[in-house]
A protein has these predicted regions:
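Short, solvent-exposed loop/helix junctions and linker helices
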Residues: 1, 17, 66, 77-81, ...
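C-terminal terminal-structure detector
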Residues: 7-9, 119-160
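Short, conserved catalytic or interaction motifs in soluble domains
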Residues: 60, 100, 152
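Short, glycine-rich, amphipathic interfacial segments at transmembrane boundaries or analogous
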Residues: 36-74, 126-144
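Short, hydrophobic secondary-structure boundary micro-motifs
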Residues: 24, 38-39, 98-100, 106, ...
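A hydrophobic, helix-centered structural microdomain
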Residues: 1-59, 89, 155, 160
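A cross-family signal for key residues in well-ordered alpha-helices
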Residues: 24, 73, 88, 129, ...
Length: 160
């Protein structure tokens, strides 16, 4: 049922998010040039890797991330518009609207058995950890929220 609701929500709201995505892509292209997208291997359900696509927010290069992040990129991240391409992953069945955020596959060996439970569900565009503190949380707190979500997942929790 969750999958059906995810797809329905993405399709029904496409009239809003597709034009926003096209506009954001044009802004990235004007500010940073090509490539427009940032692609990275992330761990999905059951730890299966998939290629996550986001709008690029940084200049390319070897400098630290803080130095490569542009003003446009900072704005895209603050508004979460950089994550609009992830709606495509929801349509493909690689992600859900709500679930633990997908992390790079290189972290898989570092999870404790309890933390690895976050992969029992599809990763989400937003998650319980993001709703309850986002970047102000420690990694331990984020993983605890992720596992709590896995244990308590419901339509009403997603709507909340």
């Amino acid at each position: 049922m969750k999958r059906v609701l995810d797809v329905a929500a993405v399709v029904l709201t496409a009239v809003v998010w597709v034009p926003l995505l096209l506009l954001a892509m044009a802004v990235v292209w004007a500010a940073l040039g090509r490539p427009i997208f940032f692609v990275q291997e992330r761990a999905g359900r059951d730890g299966r890797p998939f290629r996550l696509v986001k709008l690029r927010t940084m200049r390319e290069g070897d400098a630290p991330d803080a130095e490569r992040l542009t003003r446009v990129g900072r704005w895209l991240r603050a508004t979460s518009l950089d994550e609009l391409p992830e709606l495509w992953h929801v349509l493909r069945g690689e992600m859900s609207l709500v679930g633990p955020r997908p992390l790079p596959v290189r972290y898989l060996p570092r999870y404790s058995p309890q933390q690895a439970r976050r992969h029992e569900v599809r990763p989400g565009i937003t998650g319980w950890a993001q709703v309850n503190g986002r970047n102000s949380l420690t990694w331990e707190q984020k993983f605890a929220y992720d596992v709590w979500y896995v244990d308590h997942m419901s339509f009403w929790l997603d709507v909340k």
